Amino acid sequence: MKTKIFCDSADYKSIKKLSNRTLVSGFTTNPSLMRLSGAKNYKNYSLKLLKVCRGKPISLEVFADSFLHMVEQAEKINSWGKNVYVKIPVINSRGNFSGKVIKILCAKDIKLNITAVYTVAQVRKILKTVNRNSKVIISIFAGRMADVGKDPIPIIKDSVRLAKKFKNVKILWASTRDTL
């Protein structure tokens, strides 16, 4: 397994600086980070970030909660660049699995980053939903698990083992706060 490092930020200066470094393989951000970085317009700020990413993958998240609006936003976000991965939460605020959204977007060959994943059961559901062609990142919130005293390492190991059967799926240790 080859380890890749992604920068989790929306800070324009940091992304511009790190885009030139071979150590950083890609970027991931979300609407909250963008707001903290001073973004006033999500699309315009995203396009600004895309200009400095130099073709490296960048994950840009939908902010809709309904599945219909997630699909609509994902299609728009996907159109912004060839290196865009659209971030979709594994569940919406009502706790419903985003499987239909994932299936629709994979059928349209939209690269996805399924985010806010906490369990191996969620990883299994995602893997049953994706096709074997679309590129998919599964972002496991290891840092947040550790924050509440749960060891994320067994979940990461099991998830990597399950994802090895899919050449198009990568596991991302996400929401990092500390080294474990």
Predicted region positions:
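Active-site beta->alpha loop and helix N-cap motifs at the rims of alpha/beta catalytic domains
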Residues: M1-K16, R21-V24, T28-I104, K108, ...
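Catalytic alpha/beta core domains of metabolic enzymes, predominantly
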Residues: I110-L180
